[in-house]
């Protein structure tokens, strides 16, 4: 049906999250209709991002510099950290403009059904960092799901021996159970951050 280069482009676009065959086809045809300079700029931006953007060695945010801008900023409060599952959750929290502390990106949530255990996440790195930097509070901004709950409690158990006095809070529930944090609007997230609770 498609010439081979077009079929390959559609196939590659379909690998992206949330892109089905119809959307991939629409994007591919759109790209073919654009001027060559625009398509080359997109290709260059993709390659440059892939080659230069790496995980921050401290918090595991994506950054072209190490440490990332957040970890380097003297305006951030080093006594309060927000623990998130993924960088997209960090971005969601930053959009609220309410959180002024530092972050730690776990790299996912514990999900035995998907073969993801504590050892696949950056829990050891968090424990070492907490022991070294001694924050006063960790705010868990994990999606309100079974996986989020399990992850929170496992991390808490890992941290107890190294930081017995550490205050650990979670976002208040204005977020529906089973929802994804990245899809929450800024106002809901800001209110959940304000009304966080000990757990």
UniProtKB/Swiss-Prot annotation:
GO molecular function: DNA binding; zinc ion binding
Residue ranges of coiled coil: none
InterPro entries cross-referenced by the UniProt entry: DNA_Rcmb_RecR (IPR000093), Hlx-hairpin-Hlx_DNA-bd_motif (IPR003583), Rcmb_RecR (IPR023627), Rcmb_RecR_Znf (IPR015967), TOPRIM_dom (IPR006171), TOPRIM_RecR (IPR034137)
Annotated zinc fingers (C4-type), start-end: 56-71
Residue span, Toprim domain: 79-174
PROSITE patterns tied to this protein: RECR, TOPRIM
GO annotation terms (biological process): DNA recombination; DNA repair
Record-linked SUPFAM superfamilies: Recombination protein RecR
Stored SMART domains: HhH1, TOPRIM
Keyword Protease: no
Keywords: DNA damage, DNA recombination, DNA repair, Metal-binding, Zinc, Zinc-finger
CDD domains (UniProt xref): TOPRIM_recR
PANTHER family documented for this protein: RECOMBINATION PROTEIN RECR
Record family assignment: Belongs to the RecR family.
Cited function: May play a role in DNA repair. It seems to be involved in an RecBC-independent recombinational process of DNA repair. It may act with RecF and RecO.
Annotated protein name in UniProt: Recombination protein RecR
Natural source organism: Synechococcus sp. (strain JA-3-3Ab) (Cyanobacteria bacterium Yellowstone A-Prime)
Organism classification: Bacteria, Bacillati, Cyanobacteriota, Cyanophyceae, Synechococcales
Gene name of this polypeptide: recR
